Structure formats: C-alpha cells, structure tokens
Amino acid sequence: LGIGLAKQGKKVLLIDADAQGSLTASLGFTEPDSLEVTLATIMGNLINDEEVEPGEGILHHEEGIDLMPGNIELSGLEVSLVNVMSRETVLRSYIEIVRESYDYILIDCMPSLGMITINAFASADSILIPVQAAYLPVKGLQQLIKTVGKVKRQINPKLEIEGILLTMVDSRTNYAKDISSMLKEAYGSRVR
C-alpha cells in the first residue's frame, strides 16, 4: 500500500509498530534488532521527555518510502507503557512531530490489542483491518471493532474504519465463500 502511494508521487512514512519487525524485514532491513534507532527508541525518548528530531531513526527505502523501523524492543516498551502518564498517546506525539513531512503515514500493527496498538488507534485518522478468511480471525475482528469503538469514544473521536480487507481468500472453497458472505452480511460495504 505504501509503495503504491509512493509510486503515485505521495510522500509516505511507514511505521512498523510490530515487535516482530516483519514490515522492517520485508523492506530489506533484515536485522531489525541491530538497528540503533527504532520506534521503541523514539517512544522511549518521548516518555522520558527527551527531544526527538523529525528525521531521527527514519530509514529511506529505494522504492521512495520512508520507514520508522520496529523490532523486539517494542515488547519491552509495551510493558513499560502501563505505568506511563498519557500512555495511549505517546505515538501520537511522535506523529505530530513528523506529520508535516508526509502525505500519508501508515502504521503496521501487531495482531494483539496491547498498548502499542492502542497508541496506533489513538494516532490514526482511519484504520484498514486485514482479516484472514477463517473462523478465529473473524471472531477476533469482533473484539477489535469493539476496541476501535472504545478508542473513538474515549481518546480519538476522528477515528474511522476505512475498511475490512479479506486476506488469504481461496474463493474456490465453500468455507472461504461462507466466511466472506458472513463478513459482508455483518459489515456491509466496509468489507473489501
């Protein structure tokens, strides 16, 4: 998605908010745990009231996008956020620092609903939810949508669900067709 926007001439920042660092690795930065500055570093600096420069830690990719990398350090940050004042809005503080430099800022979240994901929801204008066409991910979607509603009511009133994107759909199987139609029945035009 980010590379597609960049190819349309947009300035894009990708934020890897997943401790597995999959986005970082998939963009060719294959050893995210050895990077000096990552999202965990930046958020840690903000928690400690240290100054953060707009370009600090941002990696530039040959496809024309920028990346704020993520790595395993986010797991430790997740635990420490529990005791932080305004813990839901630390990422928002970072986005306010870099927002003017980009047309789009896309945040790749971990599949859990921990504090890092809540930070992403508190920072976002809208979210696109990828869901595998299988029973358990669809069941998890219900909880995710409840959490999005709660964040919208309590922290970020502008948050909207841009869409629900079905992934790993094998349209040749009845199971996938049933899951797809169940989602479309429940969520209507949000399902893509």
Residue ranges and their predicted role:
Residues 1-192:
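P-loop NTP-binding core
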